[in-house]
């Protein structure tokens, strides 16, 4: 895969002395700089802190330290402020955090963007209502692009396979049109064909939209497939950064 050198790019996300209180994860003192436009992988053994980093930055678990995005400090412990700053997160917990299982694919894809950015809404005077046509269009665009196997955009998320549910989580994040995307264990529990598609979708999103991506995965081989650099986390701290081509 084509590994790009972003060493001259500016730092878009700067993490200093991050600690996170997340069950089963140690995050004690993480320093990390992410370059604009790159795909940075975060790898390491289970429980060593890699999952704690995005969950802490995005405010899902109590965290401390300092995080700056695009030169401005980001308030920790506030998911909404992160979303307002154009950061998005595809969680490893797709059934707990990721999906509204009893809602349609349309509602899953469009709801966060409606809630956070007032997208897909029509207004007249004091009245606001959903722009059903825009919601239908955006959902079908991602069903098509991500090859989500479903009976249609009105199908409930619960009825999809794990791989297709994961693609809906990606579509939901893509619909926010973020500048920065954390994606955690994106291929966990899905079949090989769906894995390749998910990785390709992330790479395409990064290349075409210029979105900076940080991907957390236990699969080093997977990180090597799409990342430009790989940060290894051990014992709750950064243990070094490797170029993706010789991270063996």
Annotate each language-model stretch with its function.
Residues 217-218:
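H-loop/switch region of ABC-family ATPase nucleotide-binding domains
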Residues 223-225:
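A short, surface-exposed alpha-helical micro-motif characterized by mixed small hydrophobic
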Residues 170:
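Hydrophobic anchor residue at the start of the ABC signature
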Residues 196-209:
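Helical segment within the ABC ATPase nucleotide-binding domain
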Residues 181-185:
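Catalytic Walker B motif of ABC-type/P-loop ATPase nucleotide-binding domains
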Residues 54-64, 68-160, 240-248:
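Conserved P-loop NTPase catalytic core
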Residues 175-179:
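A short, proline-enriched helix->beta-strand linker immediately N-terminal to the Walker B motif
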Residues 15-18, 26-36, 65:
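Conserved beta-strand
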């Amino acid at each position: 895969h084509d590994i790009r050198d972003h060493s001259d790019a500016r730092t878009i996300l700067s993490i200093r002395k991050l600690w996170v209180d997340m069950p089963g994860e140690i995050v004690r003192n993480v320093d990390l700089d992410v370059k604009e436009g790159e795909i940075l992988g975060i790898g390491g053994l289970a429980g060593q802190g890699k999952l704690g980093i995005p969950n802490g930055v995005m405010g899902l678990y109590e965290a401390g330290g300092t995080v700056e995005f695009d030169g401005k400090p980001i308030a920790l412990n506030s998911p909404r402020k992160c979303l307002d700053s154009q950061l998005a997160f595809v969680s490893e917990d797709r059934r707990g955090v990721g999906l509204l299982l009893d809602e349609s694919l349309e509602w899953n894809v469009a709801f966060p963007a409606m809630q956070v950015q007032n997208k897909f809404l029509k207004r007249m005077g004091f009245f606001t209502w959903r722009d059903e046509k825009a919601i239908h269009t955006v959902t079908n665009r991602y069903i098509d692009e991500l090859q989500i196997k479903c009976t249609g955009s009105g199908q409930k998320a619960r009825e999809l396979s794990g791989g297709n549910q994961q693609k809906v989580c990606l579509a939901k994040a893509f619909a926010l049109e973020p500048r920065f995307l954390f994606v955690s264990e994106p291929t966990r529990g899905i079949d090989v064909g769906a894995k390749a598609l998910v990785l390709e979708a992330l790479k395409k999103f990064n290349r075409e939209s210029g979105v900076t991506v940080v991907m957390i995965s236990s699969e080093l081989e997977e990180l090597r497939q799409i990342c430009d650099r790989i940060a290894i986390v051990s014992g709750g701290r950064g243990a070094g950064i490797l170029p993706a081509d010789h991270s063996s």
